[in-house]
Amino acid sequence: FKKTSRIKIKDLYKISPLATFSMFCVGFIHPAIFTMGAVYGALMNFSVFEISLYLFLITLSGAIFQWPIGYLSDRFDRRIILIITALFGSILTVLCFFSVSISPDFINLSSDWKTILQHISNHRLLFYILISLYAGMSLPLFSLNLAYVNDFLPKEKFVSAGAGMQIIFGISAMTAPFVCSFFMKNFGPNGIFIFLFIFQTLIGVFGIYRMTRRSTEENPNNTFTPMPRNITPLGMELDPDTGVDLNKENKN
């Protein structure tokens, strides 16, 4: 990145409407998972240990799922992986909602199965499994969006595009706790899952729409690179996985 060129934020949408819109939605999703998720746990009478376990599991799952999702996105149309990941995340938010909202008494099962479900519910095992899977679907969306927008850019614009995407993420991230708290106030603690469902679904639906508007045009030399959601432009520049052969650049 000895030679870099600037790119305006408004131009990012022209280059990749899906990646830009998706990143804006991800800015609402990620802060809600981490910040309002802890509030949700407190409102649901989780112990300090249980809230800590929740944060541990979503962080671990989000990190682990970066690799298989990234692997698939490098071998198939990245938009398809983005859409499937977003919509599967939507389904998981619904399952998370019902895992802590529905009593086994409302389900037409035998008494033995109801006892098993009640035991699982009391220990929140099902919730932890579902929320871990959800984190695995939602947290890699940040890196997927960066990789997808870079599919349409030369390498010298990667850093500038990453900075622009960070700003887009930050704008929505600043308002996410306030919007999410509105849902939790009006729909109860489980309103967080309604909030997450809306933005996950928006990404998937908009992705399907964009596939009808643009054919696949990808940079064959660009690959997915797992990145934390708080990566800085400098961090992108220093990461060898996102860079180019500087020796070759110097020779040219």
Model-predicted regions and their roles:
Residues 17-52:
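Extracytoplasmic gate region of multi-pass secondary transporters
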Residues 48-49, 153-165:
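Loop-to-transmembrane helix entry/capping segments in MFS-fold secondary transporters
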Residues 66-77, 184-185:
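Helix-to-loop junctions at the C-terminal end of transmembrane segments
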Residues 80-95, 197:
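Structural signature of the two symmetry-related core transmembrane helices
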Residues 88-108, 112-119:
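C-terminal ends and interior cores of transmembrane alpha-helices
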Residues 112-113, 210-252:
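Intrinsic disorder in cytosolic terminal tails and internal cytosolic loops
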Residues 139-153:
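Intracellular juxtamembrane helix-capping segments at the cytosolic ends
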Residues 182-200:
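A membrane-interface helix-boundary motif in multi-pass transporters
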